[in-house]
Amino acid sequence: MAKQKNNLIFFAILLLLATVIFFGITITTALDRNRREIAALRRAVEAVPQSSGITANIAATTEKSPVIPCSNARFFKYPASRGGTLRTAIASDTGSLNPVTGNEATASSIIALCTSTLGIRNFENPEKFEPLMAESWQVSADGKKIYVKLRKNILWQDFVDPYTNKYVASETVTAHDFVFYVDVVRNMQVNAGALRSYFQDLESIRAISDLELEVVWKNEYYRSLEMTLGLIPLPRHFYCPDNAPFDPLKFNDDHKRNNMIVGCGAYKLTERVRDRKFVLERFENYFGSRLNIAPALEKRILEIVKADNTRLQMLLANDLDMLGLSAEQWNRRGSKKPFSKSVLTTGQKASDQPLQPGETLRRVKYLANAYFYIGYNLRNELFADRRVRQALTMLCNRDKILREVYHNQGRVISGPFFYNSPYYDKSIKPLPYDPAKALELLKSAGWQDSDGDGILDKNGKKFVFTALQVSGNPVQEKLLSIFKEDLARAGIDMKISPLEWPVYISKLDKRDYEVCSLGWQLPFESDPYQVWHSSQALNGSNHIGFANPAADRIIEEIRRTFDTAKRIELCHRFQKILHEEQPYTFLIVPETLQALSGRLENVQCFPLGLNSECFYIAR
Protein backbone atom coordinates (compact mmCIF):
# COMPACT_ATOMS: atom_id res chain seq x y z
CA MET A 1 0.00 0.00 0.00
CA ALA A 2 2.84 2.39 0.80
CA LYS A 3 4.39 1.83 -2.62
CA GLN A 4 1.05 2.37 -4.31
CA LYS A 5 0.55 5.61 -2.42
CA ASN A 6 4.02 6.79 -3.41
CA ASN A 7 3.29 6.06 -7.04
CA LEU A 8 -0.03 7.87 -6.84
CA ILE A 9 1.79 10.96 -5.64
CA PHE A 10 4.43 10.60 -8.33
CA PHE A 11 1.92 10.19 -11.13
CA ALA A 12 -0.10 13.12 -9.80
CA ILE A 13 3.00 15.27 -10.18
CA LEU A 14 3.66 13.80 -13.62
CA LEU A 15 0.14 14.53 -14.82
CA LEU A 16 0.18 17.99 -13.32
CA LEU A 17 3.41 18.83 -15.13
CA ALA A 18 2.08 17.38 -18.35
CA THR A 19 -1.18 19.28 -18.12
CA VAL A 20 0.57 22.56 -17.32
CA ILE A 21 2.56 22.31 -20.54
CA PHE A 22 -0.37 20.87 -22.53
CA PHE A 23 -2.32 24.04 -21.83
CA GLY A 24 0.67 26.21 -22.69
CA ILE A 25 0.82 27.77 -19.23
CA THR A 26 4.25 28.84 -18.03
CA ILE A 27 4.16 28.97 -14.24
CA THR A 28 7.87 29.58 -13.67
CA THR A 29 10.82 31.02 -15.47
CA ALA A 30 14.03 29.18 -16.17
CA LEU A 31 15.78 30.24 -12.97
CA ASP A 32 12.79 29.05 -10.98
CA ARG A 33 13.01 25.75 -12.85
CA ASN A 34 16.76 25.86 -12.31
CA ARG A 35 16.25 25.72 -8.57
CA ARG A 36 13.39 23.26 -8.75
CA GLU A 37 15.25 20.85 -10.98
CA ILE A 38 18.49 20.96 -9.05
CA ALA A 39 16.50 20.30 -5.87
CA ALA A 40 15.78 16.82 -7.15
CA LEU A 41 15.41 15.41 -3.67
CA ARG A 42 12.76 18.00 -2.87
CA ARG A 43 10.63 17.91 -5.99
CA ALA A 44 10.23 14.24 -6.91
CA VAL A 45 11.13 14.98 -10.49
CA GLU A 46 14.53 14.50 -12.01
CA ALA A 47 17.06 17.24 -11.61
CA VAL A 48 20.02 18.80 -13.39
CA PRO A 49 23.03 17.05 -14.92
CA GLN A 50 26.54 16.31 -13.92
CA SER A 51 29.30 17.23 -16.34
CA SER A 52 32.96 17.09 -17.08
CA GLY A 53 33.42 20.03 -14.73
CA ILE A 54 31.90 18.04 -11.90
CA THR A 55 33.73 14.87 -12.89
CA ALA A 56 37.01 16.67 -12.36
CA ASN A 57 36.05 17.18 -8.73
CA ILE A 58 35.14 13.53 -8.36
CA ALA A 59 38.32 12.22 -9.91
CA ALA A 60 40.61 13.36 -7.08
CA THR A 61 39.88 13.44 -3.38
CA THR A 62 41.89 16.59 -2.79
CA GLU A 63 40.48 18.83 -5.51
CA LYS A 64 37.89 21.42 -4.54
CA SER A 65 35.21 23.25 -6.46
CA PRO A 66 35.46 27.03 -6.90
CA VAL A 67 35.40 28.71 -3.50
CA ILE A 68 33.07 31.58 -2.56
CA PRO A 69 32.28 33.36 -5.88
CA CYS A 70 29.30 32.43 -8.00
CA SER A 71 30.08 33.18 -11.64
CA ASN A 72 26.37 33.65 -12.38
CA ALA A 73 26.86 37.11 -10.87
CA ARG A 74 27.99 38.40 -14.25
CA PHE A 75 24.43 38.01 -15.53
CA PHE A 76 22.98 40.31 -12.88
CA LYS A 77 22.94 44.01 -13.61
CA TYR A 78 21.69 46.56 -11.13
CA PRO A 79 20.18 49.88 -12.17
CA ALA A 80 20.91 52.99 -10.17
CA SER A 81 17.55 52.61 -8.48
CA ARG A 82 16.48 49.08 -7.58
CA GLY A 83 12.86 48.19 -7.09
CA GLY A 84 9.69 47.59 -9.05
CA THR A 85 7.17 44.77 -9.23
CA LEU A 86 7.03 41.79 -11.57
CA ARG A 87 3.42 40.81 -12.22
CA THR A 88 2.71 37.30 -13.46
CA ALA A 89 -0.26 34.95 -13.49
CA ILE A 90 -0.69 31.29 -12.62
CA ALA A 91 -3.58 29.04 -13.51
CA SER A 92 -4.50 27.65 -10.12
CA ASP A 93 -4.05 27.96 -6.39
CA THR A 94 -2.29 25.30 -4.39
CA GLY A 95 -2.68 23.49 -1.11
CA SER A 96 0.26 23.03 1.23
CA LEU A 97 3.35 25.22 0.92
CA ASN A 98 5.35 22.80 3.05
CA PRO A 99 8.62 22.12 1.15
CA VAL A 100 8.51 18.44 2.12
CA THR A 101 4.85 17.49 1.73
CA GLY A 102 3.74 20.11 -0.80
CA ASN A 103 4.09 18.45 -4.20
CA GLU A 104 1.91 20.53 -6.51
CA ALA A 105 3.57 22.45 -9.34
CA THR A 106 2.29 25.83 -8.17
CA ALA A 107 3.62 25.22 -4.66
CA SER A 108 7.00 24.11 -6.03
CA SER A 109 7.37 27.25 -8.11
CA ILE A 110 6.66 29.54 -5.15
CA ILE A 111 8.80 27.57 -2.70
CA ALA A 112 11.68 27.75 -5.20
CA LEU A 113 11.66 31.54 -5.02
CA CYS A 114 11.79 31.51 -1.22
CA THR A 115 14.43 28.91 -0.48
CA SER A 116 17.93 27.96 -1.64
CA THR A 117 20.00 24.89 -2.37
CA LEU A 118 23.64 24.08 -1.73
CA GLY A 119 24.51 24.52 -5.39
CA ILE A 120 23.03 25.95 -8.55
CA ARG A 121 23.86 25.34 -12.17
CA ASN A 122 25.58 27.87 -14.36
CA PHE A 123 23.05 29.84 -16.37
CA GLU A 124 25.13 29.80 -19.55
CA ASN A 125 26.59 26.30 -19.16
CA PRO A 126 23.93 24.39 -17.21
CA GLU A 127 26.03 21.23 -17.12
CA LYS A 128 28.29 22.98 -14.58
CA PHE A 129 27.54 23.64 -10.93
CA GLU A 130 28.13 26.88 -9.06
CA PRO A 131 28.35 27.11 -5.25
CA LEU A 132 25.28 28.72 -3.72
CA MET A 133 24.70 28.03 -0.03
CA ALA A 134 27.82 25.88 -0.19
CA GLU A 135 31.10 27.75 -0.20
CA SER A 136 32.98 24.68 -1.40
CA TRP A 137 32.80 20.90 -1.58
CA GLN A 138 35.09 17.90 -1.86
CA VAL A 139 34.16 14.53 -3.36
CA SER A 140 35.83 11.19 -2.73
CA ALA A 141 37.36 9.29 -5.65
CA ASP A 142 34.42 6.88 -5.81
CA GLY A 143 31.87 9.69 -5.57
CA LYS A 144 30.24 8.23 -2.46
CA LYS A 145 31.39 10.67 0.23
CA ILE A 146 30.89 14.40 -0.16
CA TYR A 147 32.14 17.03 2.26
CA VAL A 148 30.39 20.40 2.06
CA LYS A 149 31.45 23.66 3.67
CA LEU A 150 28.63 26.18 4.08
CA ARG A 151 28.87 29.92 3.68
CA LYS A 152 28.82 31.92 6.88
CA ASN A 153 25.97 34.13 8.04
CA ILE A 154 23.15 32.74 5.91
CA LEU A 155 19.92 33.79 7.60
CA TRP A 156 16.46 32.33 7.85
CA GLN A 157 13.66 34.74 7.11
CA ASP A 158 11.94 36.25 10.13
CA PHE A 159 8.28 35.41 10.72
CA VAL A 160 5.30 35.73 13.04
CA ASP A 161 4.28 32.46 14.68
CA PRO A 162 0.76 31.64 13.42
CA TYR A 163 -0.38 30.37 16.84
CA THR A 164 1.21 32.75 19.35
CA ASN A 165 1.50 35.82 17.06
CA LYS A 166 5.01 36.15 18.44
CA TYR A 167 7.60 37.75 16.18
CA VAL A 168 10.58 35.44 15.56
CA ALA A 169 13.74 37.15 14.37
CA SER A 170 16.07 35.73 11.75
CA GLU A 171 18.29 32.88 12.86
CA THR A 172 21.42 31.51 11.22
CA VAL A 173 21.14 28.54 8.86
CA THR A 174 23.42 25.69 9.92
CA ALA A 175 24.39 22.26 8.67
CA HIS A 176 21.97 20.83 11.24
CA ASP A 177 19.08 22.30 9.23
CA PHE A 178 20.06 20.12 6.26
CA VAL A 179 20.22 17.06 8.48
CA PHE A 180 16.79 17.94 9.86
CA TYR A 181 15.41 18.15 6.32
CA VAL A 182 16.69 14.68 5.44
CA ASP A 183 15.50 13.22 8.74
CA VAL A 184 12.01 14.60 8.15
CA VAL A 185 11.82 13.30 4.59
CA ARG A 186 12.97 9.84 5.69
CA ASN A 187 10.47 9.71 8.55
CA MET A 188 7.95 7.08 7.44
CA GLN A 189 5.11 8.93 9.16
CA VAL A 190 5.67 12.04 7.05
CA ASN A 191 3.67 12.33 3.83
CA ALA A 192 6.73 12.46 1.61
CA GLY A 193 6.57 9.13 -0.18
CA ALA A 194 7.55 10.28 -3.66
CA LEU A 195 10.31 12.47 -2.26
CA ARG A 196 11.56 9.77 0.09
CA SER A 197 12.35 7.42 -2.81
CA TYR A 198 15.24 9.69 -3.79
CA PHE A 199 16.91 8.98 -0.44
CA GLN A 200 16.97 5.20 -0.76
CA ASP A 201 20.65 5.24 -1.70
CA LEU A 202 21.65 7.73 0.99
CA GLU A 203 23.84 6.02 3.58
CA SER A 204 24.15 8.91 6.03
CA ILE A 205 24.20 12.65 6.51
CA ARG A 206 25.76 14.38 9.51
CA ALA A 207 26.68 17.85 10.63
CA ILE A 208 30.37 17.90 11.49
CA SER A 209 29.91 21.45 12.75
CA ASP A 210 27.50 24.31 12.16
CA LEU A 211 29.21 24.99 8.82
CA GLU A 212 30.35 21.51 7.77
CA LEU A 213 28.27 18.72 6.32
CA GLU A 214 29.17 15.16 5.37
CA VAL A 215 26.93 13.22 2.99
CA VAL A 216 27.60 9.54 2.25
CA TRP A 217 25.90 7.57 -0.51
CA LYS A 218 25.69 3.77 -0.63
CA ASN A 219 26.70 3.24 -4.25
CA GLU A 220 28.86 4.73 -6.94
CA TYR A 221 26.40 6.96 -8.74
CA TYR A 222 27.18 9.85 -11.07
CA ARG A 223 24.29 11.87 -9.64
CA SER A 224 25.48 11.70 -6.03
CA LEU A 225 26.99 15.20 -6.15
CA GLU A 226 23.99 16.56 -8.04
CA MET A 227 21.60 15.17 -5.44
CA THR A 228 23.73 16.46 -2.59
CA LEU A 229 23.87 19.98 -4.02
CA GLY A 230 20.10 19.83 -4.46
CA LEU A 231 19.51 19.57 -0.72
CA ILE A 232 17.66 22.38 1.02
CA PRO A 233 17.62 23.25 4.72
CA LEU A 234 14.45 23.00 6.81
CA PRO A 235 13.83 25.47 9.68
CA ARG A 236 13.41 23.40 12.84
CA HIS A 237 12.71 26.53 14.89
CA PHE A 238 9.64 27.14 12.71
CA TYR A 239 8.22 23.63 12.70
CA CYS A 240 9.33 22.76 16.26
CA PRO A 241 9.07 26.03 18.23
CA ASP A 242 10.65 26.26 21.68
CA ASN A 243 12.74 23.14 20.96
CA ALA A 244 9.66 20.94 20.94
CA PRO A 245 10.14 17.36 19.70
CA PHE A 246 9.30 16.75 16.07
CA ASP A 247 5.72 15.55 15.57
CA PRO A 248 5.33 13.96 12.10
CA LEU A 249 1.54 13.85 12.17
CA LYS A 250 1.26 17.50 13.11
CA PHE A 251 3.88 18.32 10.48
CA ASN A 252 1.63 16.75 7.85
CA ASP A 253 -1.56 18.50 8.90
CA ASP A 254 -0.45 21.80 10.43
CA HIS A 255 -2.52 23.92 8.07
CA LYS A 256 -1.43 27.23 9.59
CA ARG A 257 2.29 26.57 9.23
CA ASN A 258 1.80 24.84 5.88
CA ASN A 259 0.14 28.00 4.62
CA MET A 260 3.45 29.84 5.19
CA ILE A 261 7.01 29.63 3.89
CA VAL A 262 10.05 30.32 6.05
CA GLY A 263 13.01 30.11 3.74
CA CYS A 264 16.46 31.57 3.17
CA GLY A 265 16.06 32.47 -0.48
CA ALA A 266 15.78 35.62 -2.55
CA TYR A 267 12.11 36.27 -1.84
CA LYS A 268 9.84 36.14 1.18
CA LEU A 269 6.16 35.22 0.98
CA THR A 270 4.36 38.16 2.62
CA GLU A 271 0.76 37.66 1.52
CA ARG A 272 -1.48 34.89 0.31
CA VAL A 273 -5.11 35.41 -0.64
CA ARG A 274 -6.81 32.15 -1.46
CA ASP A 275 -7.73 31.78 -5.14
CA ARG A 276 -6.57 35.34 -5.81
CA LYS A 277 -2.85 35.96 -5.44
CA PHE A 278 0.53 35.40 -3.84
CA VAL A 279 2.77 38.35 -2.96
CA LEU A 280 6.51 37.88 -2.52
CA GLU A 281 8.92 40.61 -1.44
CA ARG A 282 12.67 40.69 -1.75
CA PHE A 283 14.39 39.31 1.35
CA GLU A 284 16.78 42.09 2.25
CA ASN A 285 19.02 39.78 4.30
CA TYR A 286 19.38 37.29 1.44
CA PHE A 287 22.94 35.97 1.42
CA GLY A 288 22.98 36.24 -2.39
CA SER A 289 23.38 40.00 -2.03
CA ARG A 290 26.99 39.39 -0.96
CA LEU A 291 27.51 37.36 -4.13
CA ASN A 292 25.84 39.92 -6.41
CA ILE A 293 23.12 37.46 -7.38
CA ALA A 294 20.21 39.07 -5.53
CA PRO A 295 17.23 40.18 -7.63
CA ALA A 296 16.79 43.85 -8.43
CA LEU A 297 13.01 43.52 -8.44
CA GLU A 298 11.53 44.36 -5.06
CA LYS A 299 8.27 42.48 -5.37
CA ARG A 300 6.60 39.67 -7.31
CA ILE A 301 2.84 39.29 -7.55
CA LEU A 302 1.44 36.01 -8.82
CA GLU A 303 -2.23 36.43 -9.61
CA ILE A 304 -4.42 33.35 -9.89
CA VAL A 305 -6.35 33.53 -13.15
CA LYS A 306 -7.85 30.30 -14.39
CA ALA A 307 -8.92 31.29 -17.91
CA ASP A 308 -6.09 31.51 -20.43
CA ASN A 309 -7.89 34.14 -22.50
CA THR A 310 -8.33 36.31 -19.40
CA ARG A 311 -4.61 36.08 -18.73
CA LEU A 312 -3.91 37.15 -22.30
CA GLN A 313 -6.23 40.15 -21.99
CA MET A 314 -4.47 41.17 -18.77
CA LEU A 315 -1.14 41.04 -20.60
CA LEU A 316 -2.48 43.20 -23.41
CA ALA A 317 -3.92 45.66 -20.87
CA ASN A 318 -0.47 46.00 -19.25
CA ASP A 319 -1.69 44.30 -16.07
CA LEU A 320 0.90 41.52 -16.41
CA ASP A 321 4.62 41.69 -17.20
CA MET A 322 5.20 38.11 -18.26
CA LEU A 323 2.95 35.34 -19.54
CA GLY A 324 3.29 31.92 -21.09
CA LEU A 325 1.25 31.65 -24.28
CA SER A 326 -0.39 28.65 -25.88
CA ALA A 327 0.71 27.81 -29.41
CA GLU A 328 -2.67 28.97 -30.68
CA GLN A 329 -2.36 32.32 -28.90
CA TRP A 330 1.18 32.72 -30.20
CA ASN A 331 0.19 32.11 -33.81
CA ARG A 332 -3.15 33.89 -33.79
CA ARG A 333 -2.40 36.96 -31.66
CA GLY A 334 1.36 37.06 -31.16
CA SER A 335 2.12 37.88 -34.77
CA LYS A 336 0.50 41.31 -34.46
CA LYS A 337 1.42 44.46 -32.56
CA PRO A 338 1.90 45.17 -29.70
CA PHE A 339 3.90 41.90 -29.86
CA SER A 340 7.40 42.16 -31.29
CA LYS A 341 8.05 40.97 -34.81
CA SER A 342 11.41 39.55 -33.77
CA VAL A 343 11.59 36.51 -31.49
CA LEU A 344 14.20 36.12 -28.76
CA THR A 345 15.63 32.60 -28.72
CA THR A 346 18.37 30.65 -26.95
CA GLY A 347 21.68 32.49 -26.83
CA GLN A 348 20.19 35.91 -27.56
CA LYS A 349 19.84 39.09 -25.50
CA ALA A 350 16.97 41.55 -25.63
CA SER A 351 19.46 44.39 -25.95
CA ASP A 352 20.42 42.98 -29.35
CA GLN A 353 16.79 43.15 -30.50
CA PRO A 354 15.33 46.49 -29.42
CA LEU A 355 11.57 46.83 -29.66
CA GLN A 356 10.30 48.75 -32.66
CA PRO A 357 7.67 51.53 -32.66
CA GLY A 358 4.29 50.17 -31.62
CA GLU A 359 5.83 47.09 -29.96
CA THR A 360 5.39 46.84 -26.19
CA LEU A 361 5.57 43.05 -25.71
CA ARG A 362 8.64 40.96 -26.44
CA ARG A 363 8.22 37.42 -27.77
CA VAL A 364 10.53 34.64 -26.49
CA LYS A 365 10.69 31.04 -27.70
CA TYR A 366 12.81 28.03 -26.74
CA LEU A 367 12.37 24.26 -26.62
CA ALA A 368 10.78 23.04 -23.41
CA ASN A 369 12.56 20.56 -21.16
CA ALA A 370 9.73 18.06 -21.64
CA TYR A 371 8.30 15.63 -24.15
CA PHE A 372 5.02 13.84 -24.75
CA TYR A 373 4.37 10.30 -25.81
CA ILE A 374 1.85 7.53 -26.39
CA GLY A 375 2.72 4.54 -24.21
CA TYR A 376 1.77 0.90 -24.76
CA ASN A 377 1.22 -1.52 -21.89
CA LEU A 378 3.65 -4.21 -22.98
CA ARG A 379 2.00 -6.78 -20.72
CA ASN A 380 -0.84 -6.84 -23.25
CA GLU A 381 -0.29 -9.41 -26.01
CA LEU A 382 -1.44 -6.86 -28.62
CA PHE A 383 1.78 -4.92 -28.07
CA ALA A 384 4.22 -7.74 -27.34
CA ASP A 385 5.71 -7.80 -30.86
CA ARG A 386 8.01 -4.89 -31.62
CA ARG A 387 6.96 -5.01 -35.28
CA VAL A 388 3.47 -4.08 -34.13
CA ARG A 389 4.81 -1.19 -32.06
CA GLN A 390 6.91 0.02 -34.97
CA ALA A 391 3.81 -0.13 -37.16
CA LEU A 392 1.76 1.85 -34.65
CA THR A 393 4.36 4.61 -34.66
CA MET A 394 4.43 4.61 -38.47
CA LEU A 395 0.63 4.95 -38.45
CA CYS A 396 0.80 7.99 -36.16
CA ASN A 397 0.93 11.13 -38.26
CA ARG A 398 3.13 13.10 -35.90
CA ASP A 399 3.71 15.87 -38.40
CA LYS A 400 -0.04 16.40 -38.51
CA ILE A 401 -0.18 16.41 -34.71
CA LEU A 402 2.63 18.97 -34.64
CA ARG A 403 0.83 21.07 -37.22
CA GLU A 404 -2.78 20.86 -36.02
CA VAL A 405 -2.38 20.37 -32.27
CA TYR A 406 0.85 22.22 -31.48
CA HIS A 407 0.47 24.75 -34.32
CA ASN A 408 4.00 23.89 -35.52
CA GLN A 409 5.46 25.04 -32.20
CA GLY A 410 7.61 22.05 -31.34
CA ARG A 411 9.62 19.21 -32.78
CA VAL A 412 8.97 15.51 -33.45
CA ILE A 413 11.42 13.39 -31.44
CA SER A 414 12.81 9.85 -31.39
CA GLY A 415 14.00 9.39 -27.81
CA PRO A 416 13.67 10.20 -24.11
CA PHE A 417 16.48 12.69 -23.48
CA PHE A 418 16.40 16.49 -23.44
CA TYR A 419 16.58 17.46 -27.10
CA ASN A 420 19.10 20.28 -26.69
CA SER A 421 21.50 18.21 -24.61
CA PRO A 422 24.33 16.05 -25.98
CA TYR A 423 22.63 12.99 -24.49
CA TYR A 424 19.94 13.08 -27.17
CA ASP A 425 21.20 11.45 -30.38
CA LYS A 426 19.95 13.63 -33.23
CA SER A 427 21.28 11.17 -35.80
CA ILE A 428 18.42 8.83 -34.87
CA LYS A 429 15.57 10.17 -36.95
CA PRO A 430 11.92 9.62 -35.96
CA LEU A 431 10.22 6.82 -37.87
CA PRO A 432 8.29 8.32 -40.80
CA TYR A 433 4.54 8.38 -41.23
CA ASP A 434 4.30 5.41 -43.61
CA PRO A 435 0.96 3.51 -43.59
CA ALA A 436 2.07 1.17 -46.38
CA LYS A 437 5.20 0.07 -44.51
CA ALA A 438 3.17 -0.21 -41.31
CA LEU A 439 0.71 -2.61 -42.96
CA GLU A 440 3.63 -4.73 -44.17
CA LEU A 441 4.96 -4.95 -40.62
CA LEU A 442 1.53 -5.84 -39.25
CA LYS A 443 1.09 -8.55 -41.87
CA SER A 444 4.51 -9.99 -41.05
CA ALA A 445 3.41 -10.13 -37.40
CA GLY A 446 0.27 -12.07 -38.38
CA TRP A 447 -2.30 -9.27 -38.44
CA GLN A 448 -4.70 -9.11 -41.39
CA ASP A 449 -8.41 -8.69 -42.08
CA SER A 450 -9.34 -12.34 -42.56
CA ASP A 451 -13.14 -11.88 -42.40
CA GLY A 452 -13.49 -8.64 -44.35
CA ASP A 453 -15.07 -6.59 -41.56
CA GLY A 454 -12.48 -3.83 -41.84
CA ILE A 455 -10.69 -4.73 -38.58
CA LEU A 456 -7.38 -6.57 -38.47
CA ASP A 457 -7.38 -9.87 -36.62
CA LYS A 458 -4.98 -12.60 -35.57
CA ASN A 459 -5.89 -16.05 -34.28
CA GLY A 460 -9.49 -14.91 -33.84
CA LYS A 461 -8.57 -11.79 -31.84
CA LYS A 462 -9.51 -8.36 -33.20
CA PHE A 463 -7.04 -5.48 -33.08
CA VAL A 464 -9.13 -3.35 -30.74
CA PHE A 465 -7.89 -1.46 -27.69
CA THR A 466 -8.63 1.56 -25.49
CA ALA A 467 -6.47 4.63 -24.93
CA LEU A 468 -6.81 6.64 -21.73
CA GLN A 469 -7.29 10.41 -21.95
CA VAL A 470 -7.16 12.98 -19.16
CA SER A 471 -10.68 14.36 -19.06
CA GLY A 472 -10.94 18.01 -20.05
CA ASN A 473 -7.52 18.09 -21.70
CA PRO A 474 -8.11 19.49 -25.21
CA VAL A 475 -4.60 18.72 -26.47
CA GLN A 476 -4.82 15.05 -25.54
CA GLU A 477 -8.29 14.92 -27.03
CA LYS A 478 -7.07 16.32 -30.36
CA LEU A 479 -3.92 14.23 -30.70
CA LEU A 480 -5.67 10.99 -29.74
CA SER A 481 -8.45 11.75 -32.21
CA ILE A 482 -5.87 12.13 -34.99
CA PHE A 483 -4.20 8.87 -33.95
CA LYS A 484 -7.58 7.12 -33.84
CA GLU A 485 -8.34 8.20 -37.42
CA ASP A 486 -4.89 7.12 -38.61
CA LEU A 487 -5.34 3.68 -37.05
CA ALA A 488 -8.88 3.24 -38.36
CA ARG A 489 -7.67 3.61 -41.94
CA ALA A 490 -5.29 0.72 -41.29
CA GLY A 491 -7.96 -1.52 -39.76
CA ILE A 492 -7.21 -0.90 -36.07
CA ASP A 493 -9.98 0.21 -33.72
CA MET A 494 -8.73 2.46 -30.91
CA LYS A 495 -11.36 3.60 -28.46
CA ILE A 496 -10.77 6.66 -26.26
CA SER A 497 -11.69 6.68 -22.58
CA PRO A 498 -11.70 10.16 -20.92
CA LEU A 499 -11.01 9.84 -17.19
CA GLU A 500 -10.69 12.25 -14.29
CA TRP A 501 -7.20 12.49 -12.82
CA PRO A 502 -7.72 10.31 -9.75
CA VAL A 503 -9.12 7.48 -11.87
CA TYR A 504 -6.42 7.90 -14.52
CA ILE A 505 -3.69 7.80 -11.88
CA SER A 506 -5.21 4.75 -10.23
CA LYS A 507 -5.25 2.85 -13.51
CA LEU A 508 -1.62 3.73 -14.17
CA ASP A 509 -0.63 2.63 -10.69
CA LYS A 510 -2.46 -0.67 -11.07
CA ARG A 511 -1.19 -1.11 -14.63
CA ASP A 512 -4.86 -1.45 -15.56
CA TYR A 513 -4.82 0.07 -19.04
CA GLU A 514 -3.83 -0.67 -22.63
CA VAL A 515 -2.59 2.66 -24.01
CA CYS A 516 -1.95 6.02 -22.33
CA SER A 517 -0.80 9.46 -23.41
CA LEU A 518 1.41 11.42 -21.03
CA GLY A 519 4.52 13.56 -20.75
CA TRP A 520 7.81 13.68 -18.87
CA GLN A 521 9.67 16.77 -17.73
CA LEU A 522 13.42 16.53 -18.27
CA PRO A 523 16.72 18.05 -17.21
CA PHE A 524 19.71 18.31 -19.51
CA GLU A 525 20.62 14.79 -18.49
CA SER A 526 18.30 12.30 -16.89
CA ASP A 527 18.81 8.92 -15.31
CA PRO A 528 16.73 6.41 -17.35
CA TYR A 529 16.58 3.97 -14.44
CA GLN A 530 13.31 5.06 -12.86
CA VAL A 531 11.32 5.05 -16.11
CA TRP A 532 12.99 2.31 -18.15
CA HIS A 533 14.74 -0.29 -15.96
CA SER A 534 12.83 -3.57 -15.73
CA SER A 535 13.04 -3.52 -11.92
CA GLN A 536 10.75 -0.48 -11.96
CA ALA A 537 7.98 -2.21 -13.91
CA LEU A 538 6.10 -3.54 -10.89
CA ASN A 539 5.85 -0.50 -8.63
CA GLY A 540 8.05 2.14 -10.22
CA SER A 541 7.59 4.63 -13.04
CA ASN A 542 8.12 2.02 -15.75
CA HIS A 543 4.35 1.66 -15.92
CA ILE A 544 4.37 0.25 -19.47
CA GLY A 545 6.42 -2.76 -18.31
CA PHE A 546 9.40 -2.30 -20.63
CA ALA A 547 11.94 -5.09 -20.02
CA ASN A 548 15.07 -5.45 -22.12
CA PRO A 549 18.23 -7.09 -20.72
CA ALA A 550 20.56 -5.09 -22.97
CA ALA A 551 18.83 -1.85 -22.00
CA ASP A 552 19.05 -2.79 -18.31
CA ARG A 553 22.80 -3.34 -18.58
CA ILE A 554 23.32 0.02 -20.27
CA ILE A 555 21.13 1.83 -17.73
CA GLU A 556 23.12 0.31 -14.86
CA GLU A 557 26.39 1.28 -16.54
CA ILE A 558 25.14 4.84 -17.04
CA ARG A 559 24.63 5.14 -13.29
CA ARG A 560 28.20 4.02 -12.55
CA THR A 561 29.89 6.13 -15.23
CA PHE A 562 31.34 9.46 -14.11
CA ASP A 563 33.01 10.28 -17.42
CA THR A 564 30.64 12.53 -19.36
CA ALA A 565 31.74 11.47 -22.85
CA LYS A 566 31.30 7.79 -22.00
CA ARG A 567 27.91 8.49 -20.45
CA ILE A 568 26.80 10.31 -23.60
CA GLU A 569 27.83 7.31 -25.69
CA LEU A 570 25.86 4.98 -23.41
CA CYS A 571 22.79 7.20 -23.64
CA HIS A 572 23.00 7.10 -27.43
CA ARG A 573 23.16 3.29 -27.35
CA PHE A 574 20.15 3.21 -25.06
CA GLN A 575 18.20 5.58 -27.32
CA LYS A 576 18.95 3.30 -30.28
CA ILE A 577 17.43 0.34 -28.43
CA LEU A 578 14.29 2.33 -27.66
CA HIS A 579 14.10 3.42 -31.29
CA GLU A 580 14.17 -0.21 -32.39
CA GLU A 581 11.76 -1.42 -29.72
CA GLN A 582 9.27 1.51 -29.87
CA PRO A 583 7.74 0.95 -26.40
CA TYR A 584 6.54 4.54 -26.72
CA THR A 585 5.47 6.44 -29.77
CA PHE A 586 7.55 9.50 -28.95
CA LEU A 587 5.54 12.53 -29.99
CA ILE A 588 6.63 16.11 -29.51
CA VAL A 589 8.95 18.33 -27.54
CA PRO A 590 6.97 21.58 -27.42
CA GLU A 591 8.25 25.10 -27.63
CA THR A 592 8.01 27.26 -24.52
CA LEU A 593 6.31 30.44 -25.72
CA GLN A 594 6.44 33.58 -23.62
CA ALA A 595 5.64 37.27 -23.85
CA LEU A 596 7.40 39.89 -21.72
CA SER A 597 6.65 43.51 -21.07
CA GLY A 598 9.00 45.86 -22.87
CA ARG A 599 9.71 47.60 -19.57
CA LEU A 600 11.77 44.59 -18.42
CA GLU A 601 15.51 44.99 -18.93
CA ASN A 602 18.45 42.57 -18.79
CA VAL A 603 16.47 39.84 -20.53
CA GLN A 604 18.57 37.00 -21.90
CA CYS A 605 17.53 33.58 -23.18
CA PHE A 606 19.86 30.95 -21.75
CA PRO A 607 19.95 27.25 -22.72
CA LEU A 608 17.05 26.59 -20.35
CA GLY A 609 15.20 29.80 -21.02
CA LEU A 610 14.71 33.03 -19.09
CA ASN A 611 16.14 33.83 -15.66
CA SER A 612 13.61 36.21 -14.18
CA GLU A 613 15.72 37.10 -11.14
CA CYS A 614 18.13 38.86 -13.50
CA PHE A 615 15.41 41.23 -14.71
CA TYR A 616 15.05 44.82 -13.68
CA ILE A 617 12.55 47.48 -14.67
CA ALA A 618 13.62 50.37 -16.84
CA ARG A 619 13.24 53.74 -15.16
Stretches found by the model and what they are:
Residues A18-T28, R33, E37, P69-C70, ...:
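Detector for C-terminal structural segments
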Residues S71-R74, G84-A141, D183, V262-C264:
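N-terminal lobe/hinge region of extracytoplasmic solute-binding protein
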Residues T88, R274-D275, I293, K299, ...:
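Ligand/substrate-recognition segments at binding pockets and active sites
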Residues S116, N122-E124, L229-P295, K299-I301, ...:
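Gly/Pro-rich hinge or "lid" segments in bacterial periplasmic/extracellular proteins
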Residues E135-V190, E214, R311-M314, L382:
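Aromatic- and charge-enriched surface segment that lines or borders ligand/interaction sites
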Residues T174-D177, D210, E214-V216, G265-A266, ...:
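Alpha-helical secondary-structure segments
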Residues V190-P245, K268:
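Surface-exposed binding/hinge segments that line
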Residues N252-N258, N285-Q348, K484, D493-K495, ...:
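Ligand-site clamp/hinge motif
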